[in-house]
């Protein structure tokens, strides 16, 4: 399941593009998540009232939360798999407070891949996509493992 040094480099290279504009990337990821999987919107009291894509695009709170999500994920990716200290509190809050199922982490991972494909086609070829998929799968596996330890069946 681990990634090679070369794969981590591909992941971090494209992530550098994300970090150049985290708010717009995060906003687009969340909009894709909510439009593609409307049931996920129910987990966000702050955004439940946003029904249209235009309302979502106009929401500063949604943009801020998208930036928060991708900033946290970037911190995890930069650990190149040695992310236990970052995953534990994230899993704790997502299992006990927010009750976010692992399936929703799969959904948002798909959205992240789609946004990267859309915004950075030249920097996100097949090798980079494969590496990012592996990195996100590792993240989800470790979140699920922590969920299990916490007794959350999400």
UniProtKB/Swiss-Prot annotation:
Record key words, sorted: Cytoplasm, Heme, Iron, Metal-binding, Muscle protein, Oxidoreductase, Oxygen transport, Phosphoprotein, Transport
Domain Globin: 2-148
Positions contributing to O2 binding: 65
GO BP terms in the entry: removal of superoxide radicals
Residues recorded as bearing Phosphothreonine in the entry: 68
One of the record's GO molecular function terms: oxygen binding
EC number annotated for this UniProt entry: 1.7.-.-, 1.11.1.-
Chain sites annotated for binding heme b: 94
Location of this chain's protein in the cell: Cytoplasm, Sarcoplasm
Any one Pfam family match given in the protein's UniProt record, by short name: Globin
Any Gene Ontology CC annotation: extracellular exosome
Transmembrane segment boundaries: none
Similarity comment: family membership: Belongs to the globin family.
PANTHER family in the cross-refs: MYOGLOBIN
Role played: Monomeric heme protein which primary function is to store oxygen and facilitate its diffusion within muscle tissues. Reversibly binds oxygen through a pentacoordinated heme iron and enables its timely and efficient release as needed during periods of heightened demand. Depending on the oxidative conditions of tissues and cells, and in addition to its ability to bind oxygen, it also has a nitrite reductase activity whereby it regulates the production of bioactive nitric oxide.
Protein name according to UniProt: Myoglobin
Natural source organism: Hylobates agilis
